[in-house]
Structure formats: C-alpha cells, structure tokens
C-alpha cells in the first residue's frame, strides 16, 4: 500500500459522519511522505520544535506549537509519543513512530478524541510494522 493510500483510506476516513480537515505522514525531518489536499506546509523550524518536544516533553508548552505559522496551544499528550494542540474549535494530534510523524488536523464537529483515535490507530500500526 502506498503512503498516499494510508492518508486517504486511514486518516481521511469517515468517523461518525465526520472527517479530519487535513492529515499527513511526515518523516522525522519534515519530509512529506503523503498528505491530504489541504494539508498546510510545515516550516523547518516548526518540525525542529516538534521533534524537540518529543525528546524534551514540555518544550513547546510556554510558546505554543506552530504549524504553517498557525499557533496551537499545547494540551496534554503522551510524553515522547503524542503531542496535542488546540486552536479555536479545532486542533491537531501528532503521533511519533520510529521513522514517521502521523499528523491529523481537525475542526468541529469532529472531536479531539476522534482525531486521536484516527491518528493513534495508524501510528500504532506503523510502530507494529517497525516504521
């Protein structure tokens, strides 16, 4: 299965009648492996900050997390594994695997829990595959 198919079929799938606003699978260096049509382009320094927060949980909390210059308030995640952010009525979940970052961005009516479930399920599968 191609990386694009993972995004299209597993991240952009319908959950209780709702979809993520956008999603992607990125390398740890920010290289895009696959993305949905509306996925924002991360800046290199944003990826650097996200990777540092995985290594040093709490690093982004004082300043917030920036994604394509949009600021997200960092909310409780799983240290070293999942970073969650909130912005208005939406948010973001990023799950780190051995080689990738699985990213889901949502807006209402999708809930943070639904986004976490979609991103977490694919992230767990990639971890099981050694990726």
From Swiss-Prot:
Predominant place of localization = cytoplasm
**Quick one: signal sequence residues?**
none
Q: Origin organism of this chain?
A: Corylus avellana (European hazel)
Q: Cross-referenced InterPro entries, in alphabetical order?
A: PFN (IPR048278), PFN_euk (IPR005455), PFN_sf (IPR036140), Profilin_CS (IPR027310)
Top-rank lineage group of the source organism: Eukaryota
Another remark in the UniProt entry says: The variability of the residues taking part of IgE-binding epitopes might be responsible of the difference in cross-reactivity among olive pollen cultivars, and between distantly related pollen species, leading to a variable range of allergy reactions among atopic patients.
Protein name, entry field:
Profilin-6
Function (record text) = Binds to actin and affects the structure of the cytoskeleton. At high concentrations, profilin prevents the polymerization of actin, whereas it enhances it at low concentrations.
Motif annotated as Involved in PIP2 interaction, chain positions: 81-97
Q: Where does it sit, as one GO cellular component term?
A: cytoskeleton
């Amino acid at each position: 299965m191609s990386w694009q198919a993972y995004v299209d079929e597993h991240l952009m799938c319908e959950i209780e009648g709702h979809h993520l606003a956008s999603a992607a699978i990125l390398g740890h260096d920010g290289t895009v492996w696959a993305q949905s049509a509306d996925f924002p382009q991360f800046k290199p320094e944003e990826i650097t900050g996200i990777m540092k927060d995985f290594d040093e949980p709490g690093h982004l909390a004082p300043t917030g997390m920036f994604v394509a210059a949009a600021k997200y308030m960092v909310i409780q995640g799983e240290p070293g594994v999942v970073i969650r952010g909130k912005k208005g009525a939406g948010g973001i979940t990023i799950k780190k695997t051995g080689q990738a970052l699985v990213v889901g961005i949502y807006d209402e009516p999708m809930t943070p829990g639904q986004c976490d479930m979609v991103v977490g399920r694919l992230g767990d599968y990639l971890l099981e595959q050694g990726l």
